[in-house]
Each structure stands twice: as C-alpha cells, then as structure tokens.
Amino acid sequence: MSILNIVPGRLTLAELRRVSRETGLQLQLDPSSHAAIDASAATVARVLSEGRTVYGINTGFGLLASTKIAPEELELLQRSIVLSHAAGIGAPMDDSTVRLVMALKINSLARGFSGIRRQVIEALVTLFNRQIYPVIPQKGSVGASGDLAPLSHMSAVLIGEGEAFVDGVRVPGSVAMRSAGLEPITLAPKEGLALLNGTQASTAFALEGLFAAEDLYVSATVAGSLSVEAALGSRTPFDARIHEVRGHQGQIDAARLYRDLLAHSQIEQSHENCGKVQDPYSLRCQPQVMGACLTQIRQAAEVLRVEANSVSDNPLVFAGDNDILSGGNFHAEPVAFAADNLALAIAEIGSLSERRMALLIDSNLSKLPPFLVNNGGVNSGFMIAQVTSAALASENKSLAHPASVDSLPTSANQEDHVSMATFAGRRLRDMAGNTAGILAVELLAACQGIDFRAPHQSSDKLEAAKGMLREQVPFYDKDRYFAPDIEKAAALVASGRFNSLVDGEVLPSL
C-alpha cells in the first residue's frame, strides 16, 4: 500500500500525478498540520462568542451577505448552502478527477486558514482512502466564487446527502458514509462555506490536462523523431549551436531531446551525402515549435503547482491575529490562464504532428511509397488516416479558443466577473484525446516508413519505441480494417510508456 503524507502547502506536481493515476494511493495528514487547523476552528468559535458579524459565518451569502443569521440557525445555514449549491449538471467526473478534487481540498483546508474542524478534513481523507468518490457533475461552475456546484456535490456526501460511488456502484451519500464507517457530519459555522468555496475542481481539471500534455509532449517528440528517420531528414536543425544563439530554454531542451533520440542511427548514416539542403518546416522547425510548447507547459505547471497548494476559500481565518478577512482568492483566473496556455500547446503539438504525417504519405517529399503501402491503387494505405488527423487537428483549433476571455455575471451581479476556469480545464481532456489520435496516426505512419528503410535501422531508442508499437500493430503489407490500429496506437501514446525514453527532468511532473 502506497501512502502519501500531506504536509499542507507542499504537494509536488509528481505527487499530484500520483493522486490522479494511482487508484490505491492512501493519504494521511502530517501531524504538523493539526495545530493550525485547530487554532483556525477555535478562532471562528471565539469570534462568534464575541458577537461579531462575519460574512459566511453568521450572514447570508453572495447578494444576501447583509442578512444577519440568528445563532440558532447557524448550523442550518451551513447545511443549506451545501444543498442549495449542489446544482451541477452533466456526466460525473472521472474517479481520477475526483481524487484530485478531494486531495486538493484536503491540502487547502489543512493549511489552517479555513476555520474548519479537523474531524471534517479527516472524514474527507477517510472517503478518499476507502475509494468512495462523491458523484460530482462535470458542468455548473464558472470558476468564481470558486467551484461552488462541484464542491457542494463533494461536500453533500459528508452530511449524508448527495451520491457517491462505492465499489463502482452509485449510492446515496448516507450509504456511502456508513460504508466508510462514518456518521453524517453536522457542519459547524463556516464549515459548509469552507468546503464548497475554492478552485479545487478547476485546478483538478487543469492538472489532468497538464499531465496529459506532458505525456503527449514526449510521445510527439518520439513520433517526430521517427518521422525524421522515415523521411530521411537532416540532423543539422537539431544542432545545439543553433538553439543556444536564440536563447529560449524550452527550445534548447527540446532540441536536446531530439538529438538524444536520433543519435547513432544507421538510417542517418545511409543518407549522409544525399545532397538535400533543407527539410520542410514540420521536420526542420520541431525544436522551435515544440520548444515553445514546452515553455507553455512549464509555465502552466508552475501556476498550477502554486494553486494546488493555495488557500482559495473565503473568508479566511488568521488565527494569530484573531481576525477573519473577506477577499477573492476563490477567483480562478490564474487557473483559467494556465489551462488556456495548455490548450494552445496541446493544439500545436497535434497540428505539427498532422503536418509531419501528411509529409510522409506524400511520396514526392518522403521518397516513400504513396500512402505508405505497396501496390498503391489496389491499396489506399494511410490515405484516410491522414483525413482523420486533419479532422482532429481542426477540432482542436476551435477548442483552443481561450475560455478566460469570456465572463458572465452571476448572483444578481454581485459576482460580476468570473474566470470560466472550470471549462478551460475540462475541455483539455477532449483536446488531449484528439491529439493522442493525431499522434497515433503519425506513429503508425512513421514506423511504417522506417520499416520501408530496411535493412537500415534507426537509433536504439527509436527502435525501442517502434518495438512498443509493433507489439500491438504489425506492418501494413496490404489494406486492412484500420480503426483498431489507431485505437491501440492512441492508447500507447496516452499511456506514458514513451516517458522512459527521455530525460524526465525536462517536464515538470515526471
């Protein structure tokens, strides 16, 4: 059993990748967090005993913030906000996303600025460790005031409401709590608001997009290197001197990855004196384009790392000052920007891949058989596979439109500017799936092209990559039912198996 010890505010991207990908991972709160959590909850109780009026603790919410709530209704207030705000719609989030949402919320609450009792946080930890995942609809948040609807669905289970998946079966929240050995919680003042206010759903979606983008980046670098080999491309564009004088670190690192993958190839030696002057941009400018994508991925990763460790609810409790302050940390604009930048990178990775694949099937450019198959005319080979790539690349261009530039006022104009971060992060999954499909087609095409270069072989690393594909998809000696091969190659692309072939330090969470 693998255990992740959470020291609040110190989660790494590699640990968050584990939360998303490792089903049996167990969480535990580091004991060092207890004092801050307890002090924060005690501050809320003390403020109430002093008769102070504080937003969200003894007032209404949003436009109703000026409504004072009687002491005997404070617990009902917290229960009511969870129930009324659980207004999401659409298919449930995947388990991997819910795990991230829960872990992020645990990490944030445990920093001790939310005024919530330790037993509530520990209940979330117990649900996570028992693999009891709240049913959280994917749609219904605008990323300010936090991810209210998604987090309300998560929180509803804690009070015995809503629904959760237990062993894959959808059950009422009360049943889920019993399955975890817990009683439904009566929320104390501030606790309902602390649970449902925050950016954890948007951040979870964006983190999953980040991890997918990293896997796609590696797969695209491998596929692009294979295409260089299949097309008898030049190594000169990857020379370190070219990239050093431009100075962009992403470009420098990208070129190094290509050099490492392409080193010591028989295919390269076979055409050293071919007289070719320059390759098309889709081969020659890979370090420049993929370097820019790497820069975007790294920048987004840093924003998301900070956000994953942030306190993003409202109001915030500063126990040392005996003070509770209202602000706007719930506004997910940083997450929206990061997700939009990831969308650009994912789209461009796919766009460049589609162009390389189109080059390979064009015998005038690649000097390979037309559409990468013998007996052309009878066989159509990769003709329509390229059309599929073009369709996916075009769809990604629309999906890459920045979500963060949109805003619709909510809550009777009290919340008059929102981030749309939840959609910004959520659409990354569709985009990543599209790009995995594009890369799958290129991978199939490039390996087919390299097989046509026999008896010459590629580098050891690229032969290893080709071997991973050939374990599942054989050479195309004639036309056959194509779709299953694309599916197998896409699964390989998305699996992260190619990550072992590159320097893991290049990408933030590897």
Swiss-Prot record:
Q: Which Pfam families match?
A: Lyase_aromatic
Note the PROSITE patterns from the entry: PAL_HISTIDASE (PS00488)
In its keyword annotation, does this UniProt entry include Ribonucleoprotein? no
Query: What are the record keywords, sorted?
Result: Cytoplasm, Histidine metabolism, Lyase
Provide the reaction this enzyme catalyses.
Answer: L-histidine = trans-urocanate + NH4(+)
Enzyme nomenclature, EC number: 4.3.1.3
Localization of this protein: Cytoplasm
> What is the location of the 5-imidazolinone (Ala-Gly) cross-link?
144-146
Q: Which domain of life is it from?
A: Bacteria
Q: Name one GO molecular function term.
A: histidine ammonia-lyase activity
| Gene Ontology biological process | L-histidine catabolic process to glutamate and formamide; L-histidine catabolic process to glutamate and formate
Disulfide bond positions: none
Task: Write out the PTM section of this UniProt entry.
Answer: Contains an active site 4-methylidene-imidazol-5-one (MIO), which is formed autocatalytically by cyclization and dehydration of residues Ala-Ser-Gly.
Pathway per the UniProt entry: Amino-acid degradation; L-histidine degradation into L-glutamate; N-formimidoyl-L-glutamate from L-histidine: step 1/3
- InterPro entries in the record, alphabetically? Aromatic_Lyase, Fumarase/histidase_N, HutH, L-Aspartase-like, Phe/His_NH3-lyase_AS
Q: Which residues carry this modification: 2,3-didehydroalanine (Ser)?
A: 145
Q: Which HAMAP family match?
A: His_ammonia_lyase
* Designated name of the protein: Histidine ammonia-lyase
- Could you tell me which species this protein originates from? Chromobacterium violaceum (strain ATCC 12472 / DSM 30191 / JCM 1249 / CCUG 213 / NBRC 12614 / NCIMB 9131 / NCTC 9757 / MK)
Q: Which lineage ranks, top first, belong to the organism behind this chain?
A: Bacteria, Pseudomonadati, Pseudomonadota, Betaproteobacteria, Neisseriales
